[in-house]
Design a protein with these regions (language model features):
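Boundary-proximal intrinsically disordered activation/regulatory segments immediately upstream
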Residues: 1-46, 117-119
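Glycine- and other small-residue-rich loops at beta-strand/loop junctions that grip anionic moieties
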Residues: 27, 89-90, 114-115, 140, ...
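Amphipathic alpha-helical repeat scaffolds
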Residues: 31, 92-100, 208-214
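Glycine/small-residue-rich loop that forms an oxyanion/phosphate-binding "nest" at active or ligand-binding sites
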Residues: 47-75
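Structured adenosyl-cofactor binding patch, chiefly the S-adenosyl-L-methionine
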Residues: 66, 103-109, 117-134, 189-228
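RNA substrate-binding interface of SAM-dependent RNA methyltransferases
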Residues: 72-73, 77-161
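Active-site/ligand-binding-proximal alpha/beta "capping" segment
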Residues: 156-206, 211
Length: 228
């Protein structure tokens, strides 16, 4: 029928769950500011009060909700498209993942997400990215050690963020680089640290830094190496 939306509110509401997002390869982005960052038109937009009551992922809807196709790339595509990558290993908080994506966008990097990390398309991840999900290449569901082997073979330096390491962010090399960051508390497993050539710590008065803060510091340091 003419005028029938391509994606109904009922179908869109199912995209709040990972199961249905994966089945449809679609996700939700919410709010005018985030939708305004999208370089592609959404497949469907919901804006009426009744539609938002069904589709919004928030108790108090913050604006229109758009439906978009998945954006992630393969590991090979990621490594071919950027010179700096942050690998998030086992970072399960979607807010941290989204904020790290935002930092990667700011500093011209890409993001690699290991298996067990927060879902790239979780509404909280999308929201925390503040639209950077549309501008940042992200590969997901990766085996970290396998990804590092591929990155090393492609000429990337491999750095592990380890709290007790003697190296500091200022010692990061220039050139192509993968920075590996684990979850706050558990950190990186030994096999990931062993796969890296460099270990760097971040001097701090706090016992630990969350993953997104660590990512921001290290990505800035790597970015500053290529500034004129």
């Amino acid at each position: 029928m003419p005028g029938t939306p391509a994606i109904s509110p009922k179908r869109a509401a199912r995209l709040k769950t990972k199961k249905h997002r994966e089945a449809e390869r679609l996700f939700l982005a919410e709010g005018a500011a985030i939708l305004g960052e999208a370089p592609i038109a959404p497949l469907q937009v919901f804006a009426s009060v009744e539609q938002l009551r069904r589709v919004s992922t928030l108790k108090t809807p913050s604006g229109p909700v758009g439906v978009f196709p998945f954006l992630d790339v393969t590991a090979t595509q990621l490594l071919a498209s950027v010179r700096r990558v942050v690998l998030l290993h086992g970072v399960q908080d979607p807010g941290n993942v989204g904020t790290a994506i935002r930092s990667a966008h700011a500093f011209g990097a890409g993001v690699a997400l290991s298996r067990g990390s927060a879902d790239l398309y979780n509404p909280k991840t999308v929201r925390a990215s503040m639209g950077s999900i549309f501008h940042t290449p992200v590969a997901r569901e990766l085996e970290s050690v396998d990804f590092l082997a591929e990155a090393g073979g492609a000429g990337f330096g491999l750095d592990a963020a380890v709290p007790e390491a003697r190296g500091t962010p200022g010692s990061l090399p220039g050139g192509r680089l993968v920075v590996c960051i684990g979850a706050e508390g558990s950190g990186l497993p030994e096999e990931v640290v062993r796969a890296c050539e460099i270990q760097v710590g971040i001097p701090s008065l706090a016992p630990s830094l969350n993953a997104s803060v660590a990512a921001s510091i290290l990505l800035y340091e790597a970015y500053s190496r290529v500034l004129p």
